[in-house]
């Protein structure tokens, strides 16, 4: 690979087959320009730009040491051939997986590339933006734009949804959090990206007609993005930890892919994942205990009581929704971020945090709730917050809160 300047990174470059999707194509990142820019936009010139739309359709199944390795791309193509998804959605998902690979590399090299710490800006929700928040948002946005298959994209880091330029525009809407748990970056703890995908819908509860600050395009974006989780076509997340894990559901089960550093491909490692029953782990931020409702306090206190079994629940909390939920998905138990006296509506965002992981957990045999099923809620604004309890023990906490 050709040498790059200190501020420019060349990631996942590999020759491209002339047929259909490519295994890797060159994405160039000028991180200095991205971090120094004001209003974030689709960067041309020497900024962040993604020239890839997906992974290889021609690599097929790789075999190693007598085991058959099925890549994410070959798995997506099988879903397409079976009529589960169409070719356009295959390209969108491939573009998302490419963005995740690039973000994984940026996260792993954050200390080397001076991408730790805050950017000095505040996002629409009043949160200090980390440098990697800004760069990851550009990576995700531009990979989706360059796929040519997305019409509207909405991000945690943007004030309003963005309509993709007409020359690149497609049919799908993608809502995403480019880097969940970014407060963990400096400590090299787990972070992740999550997303969901659906088709346009002209019905929305958002009252935008009287807002003079939104132009026609932005109004159309909001109308299309505010949809109930039951309209989802696909949802997933990518966790950046000791392994890079890509979890995906198309509404027909939960499938787990692990990034193989030898091939640079996501490889299928678990299929039709089901959340274990009778898990003994709870994940709540108990630093907020004094702010909780008395009913919730009683529930948590009872989890700590050994009872007749002599085995109390174990507390595990990372502070990254993706990391905490992934552990809950594998080991069972419950994850919760309730409303409290400080955050009366909860803290997690419905559209790009709660709804996607709730869709995943229901496909895995679990449940998510805020008192109603989160999957059925329809947002009234892009960054709407809701409380969340999710896992395989949700009915128990519902009884306490009733």
Curated annotation (Swiss-Prot):
Signal peptide: none annotated. GO terms for cellular component: chloroplast; cytoplasm; cytosol. Homotetramer. SUPFAM superfamilies: Carbohydrate phosphatase. The keyword Transmembrane helix does not apply. Residues 1-50 form a transit peptide. Mg(2+) 3 binds at residues 177, 180, 353. It comes from Glycine max. It is an enzyme of class 3 (hydrolase). This is Fructose-1,6-bisphosphatase, chloroplastic. One of its GO terms (molecular function) is metal ion binding. Belongs to the FBPase class 1 family. Induction: Light activation through pH changes, Mg(2+) levels and also by light-modulated reduction of essential disulfide groups via the ferredoxin-thioredoxin f system. Its cofactor is Mg(2+). CDD domains: FBPase.
């Amino acid at each position: 690979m050709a040498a790059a300047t200190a501020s420019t990174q060349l990631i996942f470059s590999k020759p491209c087959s002339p047929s259909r999707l490519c295994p890797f194509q060159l994405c160039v990142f000028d991180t200095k320009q991205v971090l120094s820019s004001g209003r974030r936009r689709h960067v041309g010139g020497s900024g962040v730009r993604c020239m890839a739309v997906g992974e290889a359709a021609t690599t097929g199944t790789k075999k190693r040491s007598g085991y058959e390795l099925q890549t994410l791309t070959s798995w997506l193509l099988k879903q397409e051939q079976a009529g589960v998804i169409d070719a356009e959605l295959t390209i969108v998902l491939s573009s998302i997986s490419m963005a995740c690979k690039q973000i994984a590399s940026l996260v792993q090299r954050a200390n080397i590339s001076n991408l730790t710490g805050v950017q000095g800006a505040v996002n629409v929700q009043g949160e200090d933006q980390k440098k990697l928040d800004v760069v990851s948002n550009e990576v995700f946005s531009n990979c989706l734009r360059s796929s040519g298959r997305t019409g509207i994209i909405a991000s945690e880091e943007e004030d309003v949804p963005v309509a993709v330029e007409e020359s690149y525009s497609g049919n799908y809407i993608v809502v995403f959090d480019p880097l969940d748990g970014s407060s963990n970056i400096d400590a090299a703890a787990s972070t992740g990206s999550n997303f969901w995908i659906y088709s346009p819908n002209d019905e929305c509860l958002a009252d935008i007609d009287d807002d003079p600050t939104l132009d026609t395009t932005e109004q159309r974006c909001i109308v299309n993005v505010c949809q109930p989780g039951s309209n989802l076509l696909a949802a997933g997340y990518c966790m950046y930890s000791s392994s890079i894990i890509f979890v995906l559901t198309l509404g027909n089960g939960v499938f787990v892919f692990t990034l193989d550093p030898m091939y640079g491909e996501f490889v299928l490692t678990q299929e039709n994942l089901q959340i274990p029953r009778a898990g003994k782990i709870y994940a709540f931020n108990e630093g907020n205990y004094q702010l909780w409702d008395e009913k919730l306090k009683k529930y948590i206190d009872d989890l700590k009581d050994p009872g007749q079994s002599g085995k109390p629940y174990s507390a595990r909390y990372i502070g990254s929704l993706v990391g905490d939920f992934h552990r809950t998905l594998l080991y069972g138990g419950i994850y919760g971020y309730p409303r409290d006296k400080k955050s009366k509506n909860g803290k997690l965002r419905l559209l790009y945090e709660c709804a996607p992981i709730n869709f995943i957990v229901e496909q895995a045999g679990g449940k998510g709730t805020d008192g109603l099923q989160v999957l059925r809620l329809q947002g009234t604004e892009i960054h709407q917050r809701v409380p969340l309890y999710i896992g395989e023990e949700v009915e128990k906490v519902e009884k306490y809160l009733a």
